Amino acid sequence: MRTSVVDVGSNTVRLMVADAEGGVPLPVHTAKWRLRLSEQVRPGDPVPEEAVERLVGAVADASRTADRWGASGPLAFATAVVRAAPNRREVLRTVQARTGVPLCTLPGEVEAELTFLAARRWMGWRSGPLALLDIGGGSLEVAFGRGRLPGFVASLPLGAARLTHEFLAGGRDPASPEQVKALRRRVRHQLRDAAARIRWEGPRTAVATSRTFQQLGRLCGAPPGRYGPFTERRMRCSDLGDAVGRLAALSAAERARLPGISAPRAAQSLAGAVVGHTAMKLTGLEAVALCPWAIREGVLLRHIEDGPAWWAEVVRRSDEAAPPAPVPLRLASASN
């Protein structure tokens, strides 16, 4: 069976076409369209018309690409930027009406559950009790569990793009020490409850996912992507702390010349590093394994394991639900 996933993130629309033989999603083609929605949409503001037009074009291109590769209609979802927009429903309906693709939004807690599932499958059962950190553009997801799905999840408004807008976009480049301190205080305040739970649980293995963590890991000395996904990659908390100081001393243009830091993400790399380092310190994690699987693989795994009815229910709930408020901590349900 060949299927596809379209992930509308804060910066990029990503397509993954995968074969699902043997219950494992094996990518056969990937593509991306850079929209930078987070630069056009402030937290809580509607998605502007011109951004919707670009989104429609990207989703249509992704759908046509998936069809050329012989994949079934894409499982399409949007994360924090669209999810939090007051005109969320109008955006979703416009995309479906003009592309034929039923785009839905995933609550942050569901994002965490699906990403945890992907990390569990990648790391294997021998990893034992597992903690997960996932920095997106609009939110930070934290999860912990001993089984297939997490026992609890937290979805917090601590995304790298969001915090860059709120704390580091005042015209100073590099950011001032005061700006960085204020950013770190925000992260500590909003993360403390979830971090306390992670410390109490005492995970055997900790993993980090997302492009933000992958790029920070490369900056901290992890092997480059050309070595392939099966190369072990780890990042120590102490090394990430050093990276925060290094990034804070540089302008965005200078950061883009560092190993691993791409030009489109250079401006938000400092905020991402502060979030990641603070999260690791508060949770007591000395190091994390960098996991190449994340939410797209999690969506595919749930679709493979639970069937099309699961995704149909996700789409139905997305159409009914109002834009959710941030959820600081929630017990996860294995029945979702």
Curated annotation (Swiss-Prot):
PANTHER family with a match to the protein in the record: EXOPOLYPHOSPHATASE (PTHR30005), RETROGRADE REGULATION PROTEIN 2 (PTHR30005:SF0)
Protein name: Uncharacterized protein SCO0757
Keywords (A to Z) from UniProt: Hydrolase
InterPro entries: ATPase_NBD, GppA/Ppx_hydrolase, Ppx_GppA_N
Superkingdom, taxonomy of origin: Bacteria
A Pfam family assignment: Ppx-GppA
GO molecular function: pyrophosphatase activity
